[in-house]
Amino acid sequence: MAEEEHVDFEGGEAGASLTFPMQCSALRKNGHVVIKGRPCKIVDMSTSKTGKHGHAKVHIVALDIFNGRKYEDMSPSTHNMDVPVVKRDEYQLVNIDDGYLNLMTTDGTTKDDVRLPEGELGNEIEEGFDEGRDLIITVVSAMGEETALACRDAPSS
């Protein structure tokens, strides 16, 4: 008898792809796309007319969702481009420990692998935590990376 292989389907991302293909002509402003291997949010799109030899081209300007860097790409409208699977989750801030956020989901599980962001958002999170405010942190994840994107005060109960 052959040994049965045990596959764990409990996790929501068991074997799930980090991206999916989409035709350039179907991409939209404020949507997401992968440019030069980075997950980006589309901020501007334009289409050039069909030339004498070839297809209409789509010019995409997008910002990296993690570092804000600007990327541009030009591709025939009939070609496929990768679109990242982008997930946004909200967590309650429990603690800040050694540059990392200790977060808790609504069902009580903890998450402590999100780095405290640098700059204005990081300062806002630290100040709010030091003042003893209950903060809700929005975490965005795509293509194996994740970062804190925003924070707000938790609704008082």
Swiss-Prot record:
GO terms for biological process: cytoplasmic translational elongation; cytoplasmic translational termination; positive regulation of translational elongation; positive regulation of translational termination; translational elongation. GO terms for cellular component: cytosol; nucleolus; nucleus; protein-containing complex. CDD domains: S1_eIF5A. The modification Phosphothreonine is found at residue 78. SMART domains: eIF-5a. GO terms for molecular function: ribosome binding; RNA binding; translation elongation factor activity; translation termination factor activity. The modification Phosphoserine is found at residues 75, 77. InterPro entries: IF5A-like, IF5A-like_N, NA-bd_OB-fold, Rib_uL2_dom2, Trans_elong_IF5A_hypusine_site, Transl_elong_IF5A_C, Translation_prot_SH3-like_sf. Its main location: cytoplasm. It is found in: Cytoplasm. It comes from the Eukaryota. Keywords: Cytoplasm, Elongation factor, Hypusine, Phosphoprotein, Protein biosynthesis, RNA-binding. Lys-52 undergoes hypusination, a unique post-translational modification that consists in the addition of a butylamino group from spermidine to lysine side chain, leading to the formation of the unusual amino acid hypusine. eIF-5As are the only known proteins to undergo this modification, which is essential for their function. It holds the Pfam family eIF-5a. The modification Hypusine is found at residue 52. There are two genes for eIF-5A in S.pombe. Translation factor that promotes translation elongation and termination, particularly upon ribosome stalling at specific amino acid sequence contexts. Binds between the exit (E) and peptidyl (P) site of the ribosome and promotes rescue of stalled ribosome: specifically required for efficient translation of polyproline-containing peptides as well as other motifs that stall the ribosome. Acts as a ribosome quality control (RQC) cofactor by joining the RQC complex to facilitate peptidyl transfer during CAT tailing step. Belongs to the eIF-5A family. NCBIfam families: eIF_5A (TIGR00037). This is Eukaryotic translation initiation factor 5A-1.
